């Protein structure tokens, strides 16, 4: 069966033009071009499949190389998924204002990145482009859908693994994040889940949660340094440490090494993300993987489902 790309090539138009001509009755195009595209579709036996034009709202990078690497991997996975679905090439847009201005070019969008958008900007975008899926977090759950890893379950798994390994005094190291809704919170879901599950498991957390600042190597170093300063001389060192992200864990391991804390004998360390950098740390870092391919698959599936059925209930 002919592909969208082959039809577009023979007709001398873009893939998005073919897609919008076949799927959008209001799409304005020269009659000569319309007839040519339809003729090519018939000649090649092209069977129309809904292929929306999708933008990726790629929030500005944090400036932290390791954190940016996570989003770079995610962008690559999204592009690969779009290609496998035979969608037109994704359009990556850095500014929510630009996406709002160019809304008529797209059927929907997917967001990646850690930027927190103002409520007014999100509402303005929804007015002109109501179908969107946010990956990792959702700044406006009443307006847009979201696809997120189950970080609460990851925290429980990490705690269970620590306990099974004989660790009983377990600390947490994290940063400030945004969870759901149009608000900034002093905790992100990993810290909240750690506290919840630790309490459920009967573990002490007072004085063992170090969660402030940004998700950077430098901040990971600072927080681990503070943890050791608070507990080593007092004889209250934890024997386990769960870190919210690999980028923090790299800095934490550097600090622990500089302070001669034996990992994992004295302090077992696990992290979240399983980025490639985690494979080369010394000592090696145990890290729970986030399945980016599954996130991408679900993001496209959710967006296309919403577009096909004009779904108003957000996921």
Report each predicted region and the residues it spans:
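Alpha-helical recognition/docking segments in bacterial nutrient-uptake
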Residues: 53-160, 164, 233
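N-terminal helix-turn-helix DNA-binding module of bacterial transcription factors
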Residues: 1-52
């Amino acid at each position: 069966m002919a592909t969208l790309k082959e039809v577009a090539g023979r007709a001398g138009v873009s893939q998005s033009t073919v897609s919008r001509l076949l799927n959008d009755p209001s799409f304005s195009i020269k009659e000569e071009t319309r007839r040519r595209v339809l003729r090519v579709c018939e000649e090649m036996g092209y069977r129309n499949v809904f292929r929306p034009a999708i933008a990726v709202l790629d929030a500005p990078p944090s400036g932290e190389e390791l954190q940016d690497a996570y989003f770079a991997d995610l962008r690559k996975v999204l592009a690969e998924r779009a290609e496998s679905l035979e969608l037109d090439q994704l359009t990556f847009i850095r500014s929510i204002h630009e996406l709002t201005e160019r809304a008529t070019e797209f059927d929907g969008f997917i967001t990646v990145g850690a930027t927190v958008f103002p409520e007014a900007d999100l509402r303005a975008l929804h007015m002109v482009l109501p179908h969107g899926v946010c990956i990792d977090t959702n700044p406006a759950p009443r307006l847009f859908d979201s696809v997120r890893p189950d970080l609460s379950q990851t925290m429980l798994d990490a705690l269970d693994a620590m306990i099974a390994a004989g660790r009983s005094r377990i600390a947490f190291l994290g940063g400030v994040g945004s969870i759901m809704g149009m608000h900034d919170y002093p905790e992100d879901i990993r810290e909240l889940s750690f506290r919840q599950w630790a309490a459920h498991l009967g573990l002490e957390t007072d004085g063992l949660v170090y969660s402030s600042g940004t998700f950077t190597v430098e901040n990971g170093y600072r927080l681990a340094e503070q943890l050791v300063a608070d507990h080593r001389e007092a004889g209250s060192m934890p024997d386990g440490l769960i870190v919210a992200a690999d980028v923090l864990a790299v800095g934490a391991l550097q600090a622990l090494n500089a302070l001669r804390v034996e990992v994992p004998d004295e302090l077992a360390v696990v992290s979240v993300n399983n980025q490639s950098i985690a494979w080369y740390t010394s000592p090696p870092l145990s890290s729970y993987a986030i399945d980016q391919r599954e996130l991408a698959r679900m993001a496209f599936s959710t967006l296309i489902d919403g577009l096909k059925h004009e779904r108003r209930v957000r996921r």
